[in-house]
């Protein structure tokens, strides 16, 4: 299982290597063109019920980490489908079979202290 790191959060998003390789091509192509879009998925078993979406934008840092040292064989048709779906209002939706995201960490809800006091 590969990992997508999005933004400064450092929260890993586990995605099967082959799916991540195809997603990487679609994402980098769109961002190189300056085109933003969403990538969404339903939470997998072991996570709180719900879904997540990422807003892909050229100014947000991304890192793709693959478990397999050999590059995946890419399917042009799958990449084209990802590109088409990225152009829709719903964006790219990942199938649960491609995900291994693990538990979603709790967000710290403590209020920020006011330094003026």
Task: Give the positions of each predicted feature.
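Short, surface-exposed beta-strand-loop junctions and turns on beta-sheet-rich folds
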Residues: 12, 21-22, 46, 70
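Short, extreme N-terminal segment that most often corresponds to the first beta-strand
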Residues: 1-16
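A short, compositionally biased
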Residues: 1, 32-36
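Short, structured protein-protein interaction patches enriched in aromatics and acidic/basic residues
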Residues: 35-67, 71
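Histidine- and/or cysteine-centered catalytic micro-motif in compact active-site loops
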Residues: 9, 18, 42-44
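Charged, amphipathic alpha-helical segments
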Residues: 17-29
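Non-catalytic effector/regulatory segments
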Residues: 3-4, 53, 77
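Mixed-charge, glycine-accented linear interaction segment located at domain edges/termini
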Residues: 69-117
């Amino acid at each position: 299982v590969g990992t997508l790191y999005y933004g400064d959060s450092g929260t890993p998003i586990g995605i099967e290597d082959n799916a991540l390789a195809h997603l990487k091509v679609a994402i980098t192509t769109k961002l190189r063109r300056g085109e933003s879009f969403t990538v969404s998925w339903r939470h997998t078993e072991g996570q709180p019920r719900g879904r997540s979406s990422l807003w892909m934008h050229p100014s947000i840092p991304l890192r793709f980490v693959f478990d397999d040292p050999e590059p995946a064989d890419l399917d042009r048709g799958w990449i084209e489908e990802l590109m088409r779906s990225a152009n829709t209002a719903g964006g790219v939706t990942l199938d649960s079979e491609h995900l291994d995201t693990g538990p979603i960490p709790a967000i710290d809800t403590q209020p920020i202290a006011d330094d003026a006091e």
